[in-house]
UniProtKB/Swiss-Prot annotation:
Catalytic reaction annotation: tRNA(Tyr) + L-tyrosine + ATP = L-tyrosyl-tRNA(Tyr) + AMP + diphosphate + H(+)
GO biological process: tyrosyl-tRNA aminoacylation
Role of this protein: Catalyzes the attachment of tyrosine to tRNA(Tyr) in a two-step reaction: tyrosine is first activated by ATP to form Tyr-AMP and then transferred to the acceptor end of tRNA(Tyr).
Record bears the keyword Cytoplasm: yes
Organism field: Hahella chejuensis (strain KCTC 2396)
UniProt subunit comment: Homodimer.
Family: Belongs to the class-I aminoacyl-tRNA synthetase family. TyrS type 2 subfamily.
Major enzyme class: ligase
Binding site for ATP: 229
UniProt protein name: Tyrosine--tRNA ligase
Residue span of motif 'KMSKS' region: 226-230
Stretches assigned to the S4 RNA-binding domain: 339-399
Length: 400
């Protein structure tokens, strides 16, 4: 195993908070493999790169010689995590949870080493608890303490309903750590309350309390809101190689470094060198391409990563003009100096009519020189652009 200092440096990379870092150091000093737990409720069929922030950290623990427990919350998934919610979540059926759980297993082993991973389901122990056991578990915490949670506090004072089963969720998640005898538990910053519950319950059951590591919530493609399928700003683990590559090229330049730290396995010294190169004038797209190739290769293989940039849209994002792109010369007879993007799309036959132009612009599917534009974008007379409308229509356009 690496030294404690080397291990700690990798473990702390990108971490938001470690609760009882001294305890982690003591555990590492024993020189024995630790049991590292992270739980995922299978509430949707596919994972996105935001989920992989935790999974990447699990892989780093594996590389340091530790045992990872990838916990699928099939039982808690049917309760519904109330964290950050302003209303009670609708419960999932057993069939939904089982189907989603299967896809999770298929996706996570693109990152985790199967030989160092225990895949567990919390129904293994929760289904065996009697009503009396659940009441005893509920007796370990008070309603007053539960209402200290920010989301519960807001709902209570906003006179919005809170179901009793939602109070049980953090207790069940905490009990998972008891059942698994976890040494370390990982979670997002929004999970801190639930993670602390695990420490409290382990102490109650005379176990050494787990160390808690919280990881940041990854921003989505807009660089502002958290990555979320419902917000449409996500990169799915199962996205096609070209689509994944293109989305990664489209992130804001300043967000690239956050993605490198949380999603890349490159050494931080190398990433710092990339920053120096960009500050010295290197095109950020060239560095972003390295990030995109690494992540696409992780999920689709090296060959797919090498060819992913060859789609026309991705080449434009990289500042390249794809082969065999039609060239369109637009000669305007009036004295206008600028033209709406909707007008240019129609004139260049990239759309059939004004309604089609409105539709494709409304869907955010128009790109000028690789950058997404909205309906207000104007094209200047005398300019030259590569314009893409939707997935298939693209042209190099000269406006005279």
């Amino acid at each position: 195993m690496p030294s404690v200092e080397e291990s700690l440096a990798l473990i702390k990379r990108g971490a938001e908070e470690i609760i009882q870092e001294e305890g982690l150091i003591e555990k590492l000093k024993r020189g024995e493999p630790l049991r590292i737990k992270a739980g995922f409720d299978p509430t949707a069929p596919d994972l996105h790169l935001g989920h992989t922030v935790l999974i990447n950290k699990l892989r780093q623990f594996q590389d340091l010689g530790h045992q990872v427990i990838f916990l699928i919350g099939d039982f808690t998934g049917m309760i519904g995590d109330p964290t950050g919610k302003s209303a009670t979540r609708p419960p999932l059926t057993k069939e939904d949870v089982a189907q989603n759980a299967q896809t999770y297993k298929e996706q996570v082993f693109k990152i985790l080493d199967p030989k160092k991973t225990e895949v567990r389901f919390n129904s293994e122990w929760m289904d065996k608890l009697s009503a009396a056991d659940m009441i005893r578990l509920a007796g370990q915490y008070t309603v007053a303490r539960m209402l200290e949670r920010d989301d519960f506090h807001k709902r209570y004072h906003g006179e919005q309903s809170i179901s009793i089963h939602e109070f049980l969720y953090p207790l069940v998640q905490g009990y998972d750590s008891v059942a698994l005898r976890a040494d370390v538990e990982l979670g997002g910053t929004d999970q801190k309350f639930n993670l602390l519950m695990g420490r409290m319950l382990q102490k109650h059951y005379d176990q050494e309390p787990q160390v808690i590591m919280t990881m940041p919530i990854l921003e989505g493609l807009d660089g502002v809101q958290k990555m979320s399928k419902s917000l449409g700003n996500y990169i799915g683990v199962n996205d096609l190689p070209g689509e994944m590559f293109g989305k990664l090229l489209s992130i804001p330049d300043e967000l690239m470094w956050r993605y490198f730290e949380l999603l890349s396995f490159r050494d931080m010294a190398e990433i710092e060198d990339f920053k120096v190169q960009v500050n010295a004038g290197e095109n950020p797209q060239n560095i972003k391409r390295l990030l995109a190739e690494e992540i696409v290769a992780r999920f689709h293989g090296g060959e797919a990563a090498q060819s992913a940039h060859k789609s026309a849209g991705n080449q434009v994002k990289l500042g390249e003009i794809p082969e065999n792109v039609p060239v369109v010369h637009l000669e305007e007879s009036d004295d206008q100096t600028e033209f709406s993007i909707s007008y240019i799309l129609r004139r260049a036959d990239l759309v059939k009519n004004g309604a089609a132009a409105k539709d494709v612009l409304g869907r955010g599917a128009v790109f000028v020189d690789g950058a997404q534009v909205d309906p207000s974008f104007m094209v200047q007379r005398g300019s030259e652009h590569v314009i893409q409308a939707g997935k298939k229509k693209i042209a190099q356009i000269f406006v005279k």
